[in-house]
């Protein structure tokens, strides 16, 4: 929004031209989202407490989690508000890249809100019925997939980028829609499964978003994209604003979500942020890289799949409890140890993912 105002004011004072630089607006976007989260966080937590919107803890969960019962939840609203305000202020609202991610955040955030509402108000620990949740996610993801396929403006927008191989970029054709669908829905649910300990999901989300900010900048710059053998995506640089807004809002939220948490993000936050990461990965054509950098999310999801599959096929469990972070809790690891070690793994995987940009 302010981009257009600055563009108009440039004719009176050339100093306003600084707002045309993506990097400058990205910094302001990060700071805006973070300051908003830090400022509004205490007010929102107090309001949630008054409204008795507290976490509902499963009776079959780890005993250490029983003390979390009643902790304010649905704090993801704080993150989403920070991202939206920041992007609307500093982003180029003429960019379809920006609106795609905002649409994903809004729709998946709404799905998560409905899920949280059922848990908190109706005291139903299962929340929204799984098939309805999956159906709503599927509709939203397919809308985005079809739109991106139909509106593709260059061959690079529907290619598959394979890390480590600079000459392998196959055109996906109609399979593009399938890939987009599974990337967005899968990423959304993976982050949701990871959000089981204080700060466990938000920090890897911040790291991956920061990495995608760099990748979006490189992909939107013709010289950098050519040098690194990335698809050149004109306008993709505006995704940097979205990514840094997620980083800023996420760090601001972490201030209150770090152990012991004062507030949880709830499904309204985890489903939306996961879907947003998936959408960003699709937009910059780095779905495989998301699997690498978001390895912690993948690990959590695979642990659930293996646990359920093993129990149904053999009647035995592989882990003491899934997702896998609960397994380590039941092994006696203190919660902060599990969280920080998963953060370290996430940092390593993000750096590995960034290294693949050069290792081609």
UniProtKB/Swiss-Prot annotation:
Catalytic activity: UDP-N-acetyl-alpha-D-muramoyl-L-alanyl-gamma-D-glutamyl-meso-2,6-diaminopimeloyl-D-alanyl-D-alanine + di-trans,octa-cis-undecaprenyl phosphate = di-trans,octa-cis-undecaprenyl diphospho-N-acetyl-alpha-D-muramoyl-L-alanyl-D-glutamyl-meso-2,6-diaminopimeloyl-D-alanyl-D-alanine + UMP
Chief location: membrane
Transmembrane parts of this sequence: 26-46, 74-94, 97-117, 132-152, 168-188, 199-219, 236-256, 263-283, 288-308, 338-358
Molecular functions (GO terms): metal ion binding; phospho-N-acetylmuramoyl-pentapeptide-transferase activity; UDP-N-acetylmuramoyl-L-alanyl-D-glutamyl-meso-2,6-diaminopimelyl-D-alanyl-D-alanine:undecaprenyl-phosphate transferase activity
CDD domains per the UniProt record, alphabetical: GT_MraY
Enzyme Commission no: 2.7.8.13
A single GO BP: regulation of cell shape
Keyword set includes Cytoplasm: no
Subcellular location as annotated: Cell inner membrane
Cofactor(s) essential for the protein: Mg(2+)
A cellular-component GO term for this protein: plasma membrane
Keywords, in A-Z order: Cell cycle, Cell division, Cell inner membrane, Cell membrane, Cell shape, Cell wall biogenesis/degradation, Magnesium, Membrane, Metal-binding, Peptidoglycan synthesis, Transferase, Transmembrane, Transmembrane helix
InterPro entries: Glycosyl_transferase_4 (IPR000715), PNAcMuramoyl-5peptid_Trfase (IPR003524), PNAcMuramoyl-5peptid_Trfase_CS (IPR018480)
Domain of life, per lineage: Bacteria
Membrane topology summary: Multi-pass membrane protein
Keyword flag Magnesium: yes
Pfam family, one: Glycos_transf_4
Pathway terms, separated by semicolons: Cell wall biogenesis; peptidoglycan biosynthesis
Function: Catalyzes the initial step of the lipid cycle reactions in the biosynthesis of the cell wall peptidoglycan: transfers peptidoglycan precursor phospho-MurNAc-pentapeptide from UDP-MurNAc-pentapeptide onto the lipid carrier undecaprenyl phosphate, yielding undecaprenyl-pyrophosphoryl-MurNAc-pentapeptide, known as lipid I.
Similarity-based family: Belongs to the glycosyltransferase 4 family. MraY subfamily.
Protein name per its UniProtKB record: Phospho-N-acetylmuramoyl-pentapeptide-transferase
Organism field: Shewanella pealeana (strain ATCC 700345 / ANG-SQ1)
């Amino acid at each position: 929004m302010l981009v257009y105002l600055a563009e108009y004011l440039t004719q009176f004072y050339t100093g306003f031209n600084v707002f045309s630089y993506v990097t400058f607006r990205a910094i302001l976007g990060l700071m805006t989202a973070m300051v908003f989260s830090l400022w509004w966080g205490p007010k929102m937590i107090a309001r949630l407490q008054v409204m008795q919107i507290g976490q509902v803890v499963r009776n079959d969960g780890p005993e250490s989690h029983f003390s979390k019962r009643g902790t304010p939840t649905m704090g993801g609203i704080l993150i989403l508000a920070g991202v939206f305000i920041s992007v609307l202020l500093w982003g180029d609202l003429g960019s379809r890249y920006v609106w795609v991610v905002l649409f994903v955040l809004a729709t998946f955030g709404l799905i998560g809100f409905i899920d949280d509402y059922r848990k908190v108000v109706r005291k139903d620990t299962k929340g929204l019925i799984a098939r309805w949740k999956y159906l709503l996610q599927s509709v939203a993801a397919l809308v985005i997939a079809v739109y991106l396929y139909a509106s593709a403006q260059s061959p690079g927008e529907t290619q598959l980028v394979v890390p480590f191989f600079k000459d392998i970029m196959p055109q996906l054709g109609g399979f593009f829609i399938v890939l987009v669908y599974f990337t967005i829905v899968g990423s959304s649910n993976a982050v949701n499964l990871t959000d089981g300990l204080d700060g466990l999901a938000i920090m890897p989300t911040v790291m991956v978003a920061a990495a995608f900010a760099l990748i979006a900048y490189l992909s939107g710059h013709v010289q950098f994209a050519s040098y690194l053998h990335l698809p050149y995506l004109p306008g993709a640089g505006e995704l940097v604003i979205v990514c840094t807004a997620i980083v800023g809002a996420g760090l601001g939220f972490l201030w209150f979500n770090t152990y012991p948490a004062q507030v949880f993000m709830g499904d309204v936050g985890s489903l939306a942020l996961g879907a947003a990461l998936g959408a960003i990965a699709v937009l910059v054509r780095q779905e495989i890289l998301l699997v690498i950098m978001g390895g912690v999310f993948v690990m959590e999801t695979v642990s659930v799949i293996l646990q359920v599959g093993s129990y149904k096929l053999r009647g035995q469990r592989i882990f003491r409890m899934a997702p896998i972070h609960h397994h380590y809790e039941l092994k006696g690891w203190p919660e902060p140890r599990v969280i920080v070690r998963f953060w370290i793994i996430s940092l390593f995987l993000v750096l590995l993912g960034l290294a693949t940009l050069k290792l081609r």
